[in-house]
Amino acid sequence: MIDAACNYLNPYAQQHQAQQQQHAQHQQHAQQQQHHLHMQQAQHHLHLSHQQAQQQHMQHLTQQQQQQQQQQQQQQQQQQQQQQPQQQQHDFLSAAALLSAPPSLSGSSSGSSSGSSPLYGKPPMKLELPYPQASSTGTASPNSSIQSAPSSASVSPSIFPSPAQSFASISASPSTPTTTLAPPTTAAAGALAGSPTSSSPSSSAASAAAAAAAAAAAAADLGAAAVASAAYGWNTAYSGLGPARSQFPYAQYASDYYGNAVGMSSSAAWFSHQERLYQPWSSQSYPGFNFDDIAFQTQLQRRSVRCTCPNCTNEMSGLPPIVGPDERGRKQHICHIPGCERLYGKASHLKTHLRWHTGERPFLCLTCGKRFSRSDELQRHGRTHTNYRPYACPICSKKFSRSDHLSKHKKTHFKDKKSKKVLAAEAKEQAAAAIKLEKKEKKSGKPLTPPVEFKQEQPDTTPLVNYAPYANLYQHSTSAGSSVNPPPPPPPLFQQQMTTTTSSAAASFVEQPWSSSSSRAIQPATTSASSSSSSSASSPAAAVVSAIGSASSPAASATALAQHHYAALAMQSESQLAAEYGLTMSGLASGASQDSSSSCHMKSEYAASYPADFGAGTASYGYPHPHPHHHNAWAAAYHPHATA
């Protein structure tokens, strides 16, 4: 039973299965089986003689068949379509006759149905097997190299060739393409014997050519397997010898050129659209997409085709646009919803806006299931799940997931920026007024009313004590209030130099590395005592000179007071710049000296925290400052105290 099932599933073993079924019948009817075997052997020798005679007859007709080969293919296709339903009925009737025939009539029935029945006196497998039948010349049975005779209607082409098959087809004579064909041989034998179900003369000639191919393969000592594979010729060009290709599964993938000598009739192989394969698109095949029309359109027309807003529709129709271009010359796209009529410079922006009207939200968050109408909204929403914050504040290093949140946060750091600018402008105006007042004072030689002091950052009652960020301002502040807090006595050598400078009024030049004048440069001092005291506030020695000059005469004291206010104005203006931009404008780019500039960039609130005698009570005048601030004015910009 297992062998019978395997043979049933194998389309090329149906003859072997039929023999097994016949063997089961022989066990039931022993006498009929012996008689039938004798008749089959006699029929076997008869067919062998018919094949030899047909082979001789085919050699004379070979040249005529070469000229009419194309016509035979078309005729055989038509004959196949006509003979297939009739032949199926003949097979069914012959099988029924064989099953019901008595033993005495079995030989005659098998002989009469030799062109239609697959087996001689055996029930054909076509009644049981829906899968394609064996090849056109029968089975490769190991018992006999002479093939049995299935009818031309039950032929099913072998789609994929075997190596022996290909070798047998190559070993055949290439001069005659009919030698590679394998139509049924016994159909031709039945035609010559006068069988009522014989095929047309053209098919009989082709079958004789296949018999010649099998004989040539046998003569070439290829063995029984090569003879069987040559008889299994899988050429599907002669489709008239078998049923239609569309009846078999995967028949559309059977190639035209794999081992076939003639491949002209089966044009639908591989793909039904083979004529359009590897060819450019044409307007005939695709009428909705014409490249020829688009090629001559302008860029504006091609861009306008994709948008169907009222503005683009009017432009394509030749009408004037509803809304002209914007200030950049771009065309505007209008929302067609009544009452909205929003304008967009890009058609994609209008497309996303229309999703807001329709409520369409095609972008889905795979984490929480929320939907969005725009892809960037989905991208920003995804950062809430991943906690990705790429936007960092450069001042406080706080991070945000959106750039607009960062820009809004930055305003919290600079919310009083405008007031600082106003204060700096006021300080500059007051400094300019003080300069004008000083010039008038020099011309007239009389003390004028000192200018009104501006508002200081410290809430102290005495605004100039401990204010200025420079070290020499500490000395200048104590020299202004010398009656309350007198400075320490200078060294004796320094006192002699000071008295000599003020009494003789010689033409001596004093270097001023940190001058408080508007030029901010090194300037020589004049020979007058009043101008030497007015150009003070640069070194501790000059501060002491101004103190002695103020004690000697009331005019000199008034001059020192006015110059004291002017220096405070200049330093206040510079402190505003330091608070605004993080560095002072008076420092040298290469750095400053230690004795007067180490606290040049310090803000007033940090300077107020130092003790009152920070600069005044120091023993030496060229002291190094102990606080950890930088000596370079440009490096002060990166100090944490420098930014507001």
From Swiss-Prot:
Renumbered to this chain, region (Disordered) spans: 16-65, 101-196, 437-461, 478-537
Q: Which PANTHER family match?
A: KRUEPPEL-LIKE TRANSCRIPTION FACTOR, TRANSCRIPTION FACTOR BTD
Major location category of this protein: nucleus
Zinc finger intervals, C2H2-type = 333-357, 363-385, 391-413
Name a GO molecular-function annotation.
Answer: zinc ion binding
Superkingdom of the organism of origin: Eukaryota
| Keywords, comma-separated and alphabetical | Activator, DNA-binding, Metal-binding, Nucleus, Repeat, Transcription, Transcription regulation, Zinc, Zinc-finger
Mind telling me what this protein is named? Answer: Transcription factor btd
